[in-house]
Regions:
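Rossmann-fold dinucleotide-binding core
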Residues: 86-167
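Active-site-proximal catalytic alpha-helix in oxidoreductases
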Residues: 121-127, 150, 154-186, 197-209, ...
Length: 281
């Protein structure tokens, strides 16, 4: 995700400094897109007015941002840290407090739209930020790779909104998988069914972008099942704090656990279909 997002920034005229734990990947990115690379996250902070982090989970964010060689150690007064990772709201508030102590702005800004959205510069960015002025300053920058961007509230609100997004996706994908399997077993042309029902209330992004590959048993792409389980785990932790009932989402999470047991950890989230068309014995 981070690579195409950075590429869009460079193509829009921003002076980009990249860091990757694999320095060779950073070098290759620079050779292809311009800019420069740093050897540590701290070096990025020392060279940039705005630093954007896009990694895997809470621990990854802490490793990149905090500590002697972390981004925050290099950031100066008046700079801004943006975390595009899908992480916990608790971490977002923790980072916001750490940034405030250094007079650094902070935005938790998880994204939706998948790899295709990143490649096409059409992501949706959900932001949490304690300072409206900081968000307003970053809004034009997000336009480089986003089709929509909204401040949802103070620090943590962006991550909470992403949790809502993932809960919705879990329900929609599971329903779509069962519906398509039902259509196929009933002897219907699944593509034709989708063509018709997508014009009505059943239409969804998942139907538009995943139905054809689902009925053709194609899942070696997209957002991995193991990452979806990570995201849903964050949702469950937050639900314990708020008292929200996620009974149905937990059922879908259990299905993803079965997909992973089948060897589908890296399969797209639409691979729930596999449980129905090729049920494990």
């Amino acid at each position: 995700m981070g690579s195409p997002m950075a590429r869009h920034l460079a193509s829009k005229g921003h002076d980009v400094v990249v860091y990757n734990r694999n320095t060779e990947k950073a070098k290759q990115w620079v050779e292809k897109n311009g800019g420069s690379f740093a050897l540590t996250p701290r070096e990025v902070g020392e060279q940039c007015e705005i630093v954007m982090v896009c990694v895997g989970n809470d621990n990854d964010v802490r490793n990149v941002v905090l500590g002697a060689d972390g981004v925050l150690a290099g950031l100066k007064n008046g700079t801004v840290l943006v975390d595009h990772t899908t992480a916990s709201a608790t971490l977002a508030r923790e980072l916001s407090a750490a940034c405030t102590a250094k007079s650094v702005g902070f935005i938790d800004a998880p994204v939706s739209g998948g790899q295709a959205g990143a490649e096409n510069g059409a992501l949706t960015v959900m932001c949490g930020c304690d300072d409206q002025k900081v968000f307003d300053r970053l809004r034009p920058v997000f336009d480089a790779y986003a089709k929509a961007c909204q401040r949802m509230g103070d620090a943590g609100a962006g991550q909470l909104t992403k949790m809502v997004n993932q809960i919705c996706i879990a329900g929609v994908v599971s329903g779509l998988a069962e519906a398509l399997n039902f259509a196929m077993r009933a002897g219907l042309d699944a593509d034709q069914v989708v063509e018709v029902i997508s014009k009505g209330a059943a239409q969804s992004w998942q139907m538009e972008n995943r139905s054809k590959t689902m009925v053709r048993d194609q899942f070696e792409f997209g957002f991995a099942a193991e990452w979806m389980r990570k995201d849903l785990g964050i949702c469950f932790d937050e639900a314990k704090n708020s008292g929200a009932d996620l009974t149905m989402t937990k059922l879908v999470d259990a299905l993803y656990a079965r997909v992973i047991e089948m060897g589908g950890a890296r399969w797209d989230t639409s691979s729930l279909m596999k449980l129905l068309t090729h049920p494990p014995k």
